[in-house]
């Protein structure tokens, strides 16, 4: 009897944290590009400006908030998706149909997006702080300090500013990443040319990262603008209308850096996740 291993519910959060440590500078540059009122700098120019102005370590501003976000948002969506997927397939002979994976991904992402909104808000603010004049900077010491100060100075409700947008984006990203990864891996393995190895994980996660980038970019731009606002937007629709005034391309501002960040992040997340599953997962006997 052969032996397989299933992922533990918290592996998704750990894998996402590992990926976030590698891709955080790209995430920071993406936020900077999206919060420009006009297109002035591209990714390389923005990176050089940040390093020149605040030093190399400034590329890791807000890392604690990013890790906090992964341990709320990503842990929740991975835990729900993988737990429900494994439950739904434990007595079946084959994998879930793709539409079921999409449904699971949507539900998991909506829930994870809502749970992760407070940490996401602090993450965006910490990354964008260096762009503000010194007198206007929030200067959060770390993620927990940011969460506490937002709740104390602006209200608990403010912690969930942009929750609708974050949840919607979470659903799209999770469909793009988890659902498409499962489907891509299934299709790659079904060819018979590749086995369940690191190269298969790389190819499948690269495809998933591309799908997630295209699905969520317009919502990602609106979410970032809403979370970084000081009350100038009345809601999601108003934010969308104001962004539309800048032209259709405004909804895809930062698309290239978003892909440069999200695709490697997706690849690293699933590479870490598969290694965690392989070495530390729950043993599942199979015939």
Swiss-Prot record:
Superkingdom of the source species: Eukaryota
Membrane topology: Multi-pass membrane protein
Solcar repeats: 7-87, 100-187, 196-279
Record-annotated membrane-spanning stretches: 9-29, 62-81, 102-122, 162-181, 202-222, 254-274
Keywords, comma-separated and alphabetical: Acetylation, Antiport, Lipid transport, Membrane, Mitochondrion, Mitochondrion inner membrane, Repeat, Transmembrane, Transmembrane helix, Transport
GO annotation, biological process: gluconeogenesis; glyceraldehyde-3-phosphate biosynthetic process; lipid transport; mitochondrial transport
Subcellular location: Mitochondrion inner membrane
Similarity-based family: Belongs to the mitochondrial carrier (TC 2.A.29) family.
Xref: PANTHER family: MITOCHONDRIAL DICARBOXYLATE CARRIER-RELATED
Protein name per the record: Mitochondrial dicarboxylate carrier
Biological source species: Mus musculus (Mouse)
């Amino acid at each position: 009897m052969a032996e397989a291993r299933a992922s533990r519910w918290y592996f998704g959060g750990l894998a996402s944290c590992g990926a976030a440590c590698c891709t955080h500078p790209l995430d920071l540059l993406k936020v900077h590009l999206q919060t420009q009122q006009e297109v002035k700098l591209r990714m390389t120019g923005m990176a050089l400006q940040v390093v020149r102005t605040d030093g190399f370590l400034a590329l890791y501003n807000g890392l604690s908030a990013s890790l906090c976000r992964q341990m709320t948002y990503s842990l929740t969506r991975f835990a729900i998706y993988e737990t429900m997927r494994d439950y739904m397939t434990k007595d079946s002979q084959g994998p879930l149909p793709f539409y079921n994976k999409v449904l699971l991904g949507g539900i998991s992402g909506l829930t994870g997006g809502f749970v992760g909104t407070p940490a996401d808000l602090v993450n965006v603010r910490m990354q964008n702080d260096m762009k503000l004049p010194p007198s206007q900077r929030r200067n959060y010491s770390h993620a927990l300090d940011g969460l506490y100060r937002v709740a104390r100075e602006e209200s608990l409700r403010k912690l969930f500013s942009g929750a609708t947008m974050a949840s919607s984006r979470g659903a799209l990203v999770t469909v793009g990443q988890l659902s498409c990864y499962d489907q891509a891996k299934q299709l790659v393995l079904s060819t018979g040319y590749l086995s369940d190895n690191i190269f298969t994980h790389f190819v499948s996660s690269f495809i998933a990262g591309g799908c997630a980038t295209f699905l969520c970019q317009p919502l990602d731009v609106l979410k970032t603008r809403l979370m970084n606002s000081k009350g100038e937007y009345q809601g999601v629709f108003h934010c969308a209308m104001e962004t539309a005034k800048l032209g259709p391309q405004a909804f895809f501002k930062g698309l290239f850096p978003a892909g440069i960040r999200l695709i490697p992040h997706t690849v690293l997340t699933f590479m870490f996740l598969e290694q965690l599953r392989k070495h530390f997962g729950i043993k599942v006997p199979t015939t």
